[in-house]
C-alpha cells in the first residue's frame, strides 16, 4: 500500500488573457515566476519584425522591469500579419499583468498599472473593433465604384 502524500501543493497562481488586433489573436498565460517573457517559445527580443521591437517593449518600458520580475508570461499568437500580431502580443501582455495583479496582488497596484497604460496608449488594454469590410459588386472594393461613362 502506498503511503499518503504528506506534502500538499498549493494551487498555481496563474491567469490566462487574450489580446486581439484584426484577425491576430494572442493568448497570454501569466503565472508567478522570475520575469521570463516568451512569445511562441522564443524570447521577446527575437520576435520579428525587428522594426516593431519597441512596440513589444512598451509595457515593460512604461512600467519598469520590477513589475514583471515576479511573473512569467508565455504568449502564443496566431493569425493576422506581422504588425497585427505585434499589437495583439503587447495587448495580451498588458492585460495579463493587470489581471494577475488584480487577482493575486492588490487592487491599488493594479489601478496604478492600468492608469499608466491607458494614459500612454488605450489600445494596450482595449481591443480595436475595426475589421476589414467585405467587397461588394459594382466596384473594385468595398466602397469604390467602377467609373461611369456617359458616351
Curated annotation (Swiss-Prot):
Q: Which InterPro entries match?
A: Ribosomal_Su5_D2-typ_SF, Ribosomal_uS9, Ribosomal_uS9_CS, Ribsml_uS5_D2-typ_fold_subgr
Q: Please list the GO terms describing molecular function.
A: RNA binding; structural constituent of ribosome
Q: This protein's superkingdom?
A: Eukaryota
Entry's Gene Ontology cellular component terms: cytosolic small ribosomal subunit
Q: Which GO terms describe its biological process?
A: maturation of SSU-rRNA from tricistronic rRNA transcript (SSU-rRNA, 5.8S rRNA, LSU-rRNA); translation
Record key words, sorted: Ribonucleoprotein, Ribosomal protein
Give the UniProt family note.
Answer: Belongs to the universal ribosomal protein uS9 family.
The molecule here is called Small ribosomal subunit protein uS9
Q: Which source organism does the UniProt entry give?
A: Spodoptera frugiperda (Fall armyworm)
